[in-house]
Regions:
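Conserved phosphate- and dinucleotide-binding cores of soluble alpha/beta proteins
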Residues: 84-96, 100-119
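A cross-family phosphate/adenosyl-ligand binding-site feature
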Residues: 1-97
Length: 119
């Protein structure tokens, strides 16, 4: 297994256990030589996964819709950052670039990505 897609929220949850879990996921994957493919954000759980994987020397590939790049939420420190036209292309690229997926808490967008991956 080379890379896993991580589906998670861009918000910072009230309970810090979720941030700790996101960091553990990123660090754990990097320690095993497994790259991270994720939503490309620098905030919330997304940012925690990316930052911890990068800090551990891991590969982090962000996939972010063009509309979100303009609002300055894109993580500029990713190994690769793919800017795509919209959510459909984002979900397709998640599938193309990864060998499996992990879902950690998020909102409606996370659930949408999860169901797309399952189907």
């Amino acid at each position: 297994m080379n890379r896993l897609a991580i589906y998670c929220g861009s918000a910072t949850p009230a309970d810090p256990v979720y941030i700790e879990t996101a960091r553990a996921v990123g660090q754990g994957l990097a320690a095993r030589g497994i790259g991270v493919v994720y939503g490309g954000g620098r905030l919330g759980l997304m940012g925690a996964v990316a930052d911890s994987a990068l800090a551990a020397g891991g590969e982090v590939i962000g996939v972010i819709p063009e509309a979100l790049v303009g609002s300055e939420v894109a993580h500029r420190g990713c190994t690769e950052l793919h800017v795509v036209a919209g959510m459909h292309e984002r979900k397709r690229l998640f599938t193309d670039l990864s060998d499996g997926f992990i879902t950690i808490p998020g909102g409606v967008g996370t659930m949408d990505e999860l169901w797309e991956a399952i189907s």
